[in-house]
Swiss-Prot record:
Belongs to the class-II aminoacyl-tRNA synthetase family. Type 1 subfamily. This is Aspartate--tRNA(Asp/Asn) ligase. Homodimer. The gene is aspS. It comes from Arthrobacter sp. (strain FB24). L-aspartate binds at E169, R215, H447, R488. It is found in: Cytoplasm.
């Protein structure tokens, strides 16, 4: 046995005991023939006193040691209340160097700032630092809590395939060549969606797994090409059943950081979320809401406001902003694809100022403050144009205002469910936002193609797709979507109608989803589920900005791995064996055939 005790476990009750310890040299301090070594392992740090000069002079940071010694009370005045082991020290009797270390690319110290590229390139060193190590252990605890809760509720953990066929699910697949079937390819799953539905057909009425998922998306901030979901599906359930389960999971997870989340969590419809907050994942830690002014400006002479939608959001105290700050808002808006962000300053004397104010009628000027709830000293920002992008711009401005003015308390937690989302959206809009349309039709699914319409739209969703609402529900925390689910389609004819609307005829649907449609022929039960974005959930629990901080070996921008330098070319032999360059032989003409 290389050690008898963990370094972080030693306490006053161990005084007088001989112990064998193992760990890394954290810090070393020489004091006239005596060295004090902070020895660190996964459990914590203990101070080791080394009196042999020939031993301690050869020690360097991150050397790996085995120490045999006696636990002793620290001299009075030398206690360290910052350490759990701060009452004791270990007097070394034998020190063995188990391994040495080269000079480090950065210090193993959470108080030292280290660039992300260096951290990811040497991630194994970064994980020795207290912060990253704490995040990994918190993630493990979150896994444990979820598993225990679901196990108590009768859920069965089942692993689904990570090599499957390519099926359109809203993003691009990562594809893998099938060596034994040249010209054919596997795909890595974007989610376990189809398999978990087939498990319901198979009679596993309560399923879950902590699933690895893969999406070949264009680079977006804080996205990873491979990510983790807590994936759940159940039979004979309704929306309220899954929402209740989701709330139980959230409540248990947040108890890990000593936060009690009150339940039931409030619900808001998708339509209300977009109208009031300009987002389908609203941050409810503050109450600033958008105001629609389309009716208010219906007779306006101002050309910019002659638009399908006009809306506003108020920045409290914003009238005192310098011209430079107001110009910066215009650049901020342009970075989001807008032409700018119109504004009116409501001066302390009640007068309206700014470029927009001079274009308003006396009636509009007189009624504007009341219409938007502005007070003297506030700034009113406007967006005008098509409803969806205008609301999105105002919603982003709302959050920016919340941060800039201190309306958002970072210590607060605000959850909501967003329900009754549209079932479909124009395919062109989905593609423009970076998603992949499932079929060639004019409409594609907002969530995915397997989401059931609400009962009142069951007969009409394919005739009037713009009006159809889905049985979908997303859970949002502090403006982050942390989970989403739906009641699923479980009848073959309904699923075929959805595919047809999305531009998949019966032959295409059979080719791509035939195994699912076949399963629906044999008594598929009503079912529904939810998937939590596990990386985002743990990041929120850990209080970190990026999901990269809670993933053991994350990718950097563009899906690049600085540690292994993946992706990387493969050899010509590997290409040949994998059949990457396989081309089917052209069919030879029949020499006996005659021309017509």
């Amino acid at each position: 046995m290389l050690r008898t005790h963990d370094l972080g476990s030693l306490r006053s009750e161990h005084i007088g005991q001989t112990v064998t310890l193992a760990g890394w040299v954290g810090r070393r301090r020489d004091h006239g023939g005596v060295a004090f070594v902070d020895l660190r392992d996964a459990s914590g740090v203990s101070q080791v006193v080394v009196r042999e000069e020939e031993v301690f002079h050869g020690l360097r940071n991150e050397y790996v040691l085995q120490v045999i010694g006696t636990v002793s009370q620290r001299p009075e005045g030398n206690e360290n209340p910052a350490l759990a082991t701060g009452q004791i020290e270990v007097i070394a009797e034998k020190v063995t160097i188990l391994n040495t270390s080269d000079p480090l690319p950065f210090q193993i110290d959470e108080h030292v700032e280290v660039g992300e590229e260096a951290r990811l390139k040497h991630r194994y060193l970064d994980l020795r630092r207290p912060g990253p190590a704490r995040n990994m252990r918190l993630r493990s605890e979150a896994n444990r809590v979820a598993r225990e809760l679901l196990h108590r509720d009768g859920y069965v953990e089942i692993e689904t395939p990570t090599l499957t066929r390519s099926t359109p699910e809203g993003a691009r697949d990562f594809v893998v060549p099938a060596r034994l079937a040249p010209g054919s390819w596997y795909a890595l799953p974007q989610s376990p969606q189809l398999f978990k539905q087939l498990l319901q057909v198979g009679g596993f009425e309560k399923y879950y797994q902590i699933a690895r998922c893969y999406r070949d998306e264009d680079f977006r901030a804080d996205r990873q090409p491979e990510f983790t979901q807590l994936d759940i599906e159940a039979s004979f359930v309704e929306q309220d059943d899954i929402i209740s389960l989701g709330e139980s999971i959230v409540k248990a997870l947040w108890q890990l950081i000593d936060v009690e989340i009150p339940t039931p969590i409030q619900r808001i419809t998708y339509a209300d979320a977009m109208a009031r907050y300009g987002s389908d994942k609203p941050d409810l830690r503050f109450g600033l809401e958008l105001t629609e002014l389309t009716e208010f400006f219906k007779d306006t002479n101002f050309g910019v406001f002659k638009a399908p939608y006009v809306g506003a959001v108020v920045m409290p105290g914003g009238a005192s902003q310098a011209r430079r700050a107001l110009d910066a808002w215009q650049e901020w808006a342009k970075q989001r694809g807008a032409k700018g962000l119109a504004y009116v300053l409501f001066k302390e004397d009640g007068e309206l100022a700014g470029p927009v104010a001079k274009n308003l009628t006396d009636t509009e000027r007189a009624g504007l403050a009341d219409a938007v709830g502005a007070k003297p000293g506030d700034c009113i920002f406007f967006a005008a144009g098509e409803k969806t992008p205008s609301r999105a711009l105002l919603g982003a401005a709302r959050v920016e205002i919340g941060h800039r003015t201190g309306l958002i308390n970072p210590a607060d937690w605000a959850f909501c469910w967003v329900v009754d989302a549209p079932m479909f959206e124009p395919a062109a809009a989905a593609v423009a936002s970076g998603d992949v349309a499932v079929g060639a039709g004019q409409w594609t699914a907002v969530h995915h193609a397997f989401t059931s319409p609400k009962p009142e739209f069951m007969d009409s969703f394919d005739k009037d797709p713009e009006s159809a609402l889905s049985y979908a529900y997303d859970i949002v925390c502090n403006g982050n979507e942390i989970g989403g689910g739906s009641i699923r389609i479980h009848e073959r004819d309904v699923q075929e109608r959805v595919f047809e609307l999305m531009g998949l005829d019966k032959a295409d649907a059979e080719t791509k989803f035939g195994f699912l449609l076949e399963g629906f022929k044999f008594g598929a039960p009503p079912h529904g589920g939810i998937a939590f974005g596990w990386d985002r959930v743990v990041a929120l629990l850990a209080g970190v900005e990026s999901i990269r901080d809670v993933i053991a070996f994350p990718k950097s921008g563009g899906g690049y791995d600085p540690l292994t330098q993946a992706p990387a070319p493969i050899t010509a032999q590997q290409r040949k064996e994998a059949g990457v360059d396989f081309k089917p032989e052209a069919k030879k003409a029949d020499p006996g055939a005659t021309k017509a």
